[in-house]
Swiss-Prot record:
PANTHER family: LARGE RIBOSOMAL SUBUNIT PROTEIN BL27M, RIBOSOMAL PROTEIN L27. The lineage of its organism: Bacteria, Pseudomonadati, Bacteroidota, Flavobacteriia, Flavobacteriales. This is Large ribosomal subunit protein bL27. Disulfide bonds: none annotated. One of its GO terms (cellular component) is ribosome. InterPro entries: Ribosomal_bL27. Signal peptide: none annotated. Keywords: Ribonucleoprotein, Ribosomal protein. Belongs to the bacterial ribosomal protein bL27 family. It comes from Karelsulcia muelleri (strain GWSS). GO terms for biological process: translation. GO terms for molecular function: structural constituent of ribosome.
Length: 84
């Protein structure tokens, strides 16, 4: 057994940078084609009309219009863009 504690035992002190996930444009706001509406991990929000999902589950607008959020279940929410 050691009589003195080993110095330099800092196992903590590292952290990852935040991924900046979440809603970028809210309901009622205007979206341009290609603009990011939601950045997410997995499919918490699902695309509906005039919206497409990227390979990292980011939801983008296809057209110029107003954003509409709609919930069907307690967990599922759908995003669509209504043309103006």
């Amino acid at each position: 057994m050691a009589h003195k504690k080993g110095v330099g035992s800092s196992r903590n002190g590292r952290d990852s940078f935040s991924k900046r996930l979440g809603v970028k444009l809210f309901g009622g706001q205007i979206a341009k084609p290609g603009s990011i509406i939601i950045r997410q991990r997995g499919t918490k929000h699902h695309p509906k009309k005039n919206v497409y999902m990227g390979k990292d589950h980011t939801i983008h607008s296809l057209i110029y219009g107003k954003i509409l959020f709609k919930k069907t279940n307690k967990k599922k929410s759908f995003i669509s863009v209504i043309p103006i």
